[in-house]
Amino acid sequence: MPYLKFLVAAIAGSCMLVSIAKAEELPAPIQMLANQGLTIVDTFPAPGGLKGYAAEFQGQAIALYLTADGEHVIVGNLLNLEGRDIAADPLYQLVTGPAQEHAWQQMERATLLQDGDADAPRIIYTMTDPNCPYCHRFREAAEPWIAAGKVQLRHLMVGIIREESPAQAAAIMGSPDPAEALVNHINRRERGGIEAIPRFVRIGEPVIRANHRIMRELNLSSTPIVYYRDENNHVQVIRGMPQPQQFEAIFGPRP
């Protein structure tokens, strides 16, 4: 596994997880990985004399297993007889779940493009670049639910794909009706999208800069990124264009 070589060369990017390293002295192999950039979040039970550690690195949950002699650490998946990773539930509870709730809260506090009925029963957050074709496809896929008043998309507009993306994103956010501007842009995408009118760009630029900071804080670098709550009210995230079989899980029953 190329984990260790990769970890040495990078710096951890997450601040919201509480590390147990500050509260207790870690075994040497675990401390070695903490020194290389991992955030050691907590421990969890593991079989075979191992001790599990839930860690986070650049937004990704990682399972570590300390051997009984305290001299070695195993990094990666540990499967049971059914082929299930025994760390799946602990990592979600200790790392992934809290991180995704944190991301949801950051989205709630951001300046967003509200696309759909304000009273819609289902809210979905998505990071959108004006020139991202998969963002366009996601918006088009959501249209039946938006038109029926079942879903409101809340777009965190960013500009990362093309040179003109930041100005177009700012123009959309600075326009009198950002939701209408986004739909017009998508409908005109084959002709280059909407014009980046300077007065609208000036209004929208601070929003786009703030949204880029959120992307960096969440260790995200692509679009679309979709956040939604599942039937258990847990925050789920999909990176990239969701598959059609995922639509009802995201948007709810088809109208």
Model-inferred region functions:
Residues 234-238:
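Structural signal for short hydrophobic segments within the conserved structured cores
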Residues 6, 17, 22-165, 184, ...:
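Extracytoplasmic thiol/disulfide redox context detector
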Residues 231:
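Acidic beta-to-alpha connecting loop that harbors the catalytic carboxylate
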